[in-house]
From Swiss-Prot:
Regions that span the bilayer: none
Residues annotated with Tryptophan amide modification: W8
InterPro entries from the UniProt entry: Adipokinetic_hormone_CS
Keywords: Amidation, Cleavage on pair of basic residues, Disulfide bond, Flight, Hormone, Neuropeptide, Pyrrolidone carboxylic acid, Secreted
Positions where Pyrrolidone carboxylic acid occurs in the chain: Q1
Protein's UniProt keywords contain Iron: no
Family to which this protein belongs: Belongs to the AKH/HRTH/RPCH family.
Description of how the protein assembles with itself and partners: Adipokinetic hormone precursor-related peptide (APRP) can form three type of disulfide-bond dimers: p1 (alpha-alpha), p2 (alpha-beta), and p3 (beta-beta).
Name of this chain's protein: Adipokinetic prohormone type 2
Coiled-coil stretches noted in the UniProt entry, renumbered to this chain: none
Function: This hormone, released from cells in the corpora cardiaca, causes release of diglycerides from the fat body and stimulation of muscles to use these diglycerides as an energy source during energy-demanding processes.
Main location: secreted
Subcellular location: Secreted
Length: 39
């Protein structure tokens, strides 16, 4: 979970990052929120 957080931060800050990877991370975060396990 911590590794995923740092990877997400890097992608979020890099405008040249892979958009599909960005969307995948975003979807994973939303899924965690919906399941009540955001943190």
């Amino acid at each position: 979970q911590l590794n995923f957080s740092t990877g997400w931060g890097r992608r979020y800050a890099d405008p040249n990052a892979d958009p599909m990877a960005f969307l995948t991370k975003l979807i994973q975060i939303e899924a965690r929120k919906l399941s009540g396990c955001s943190n």
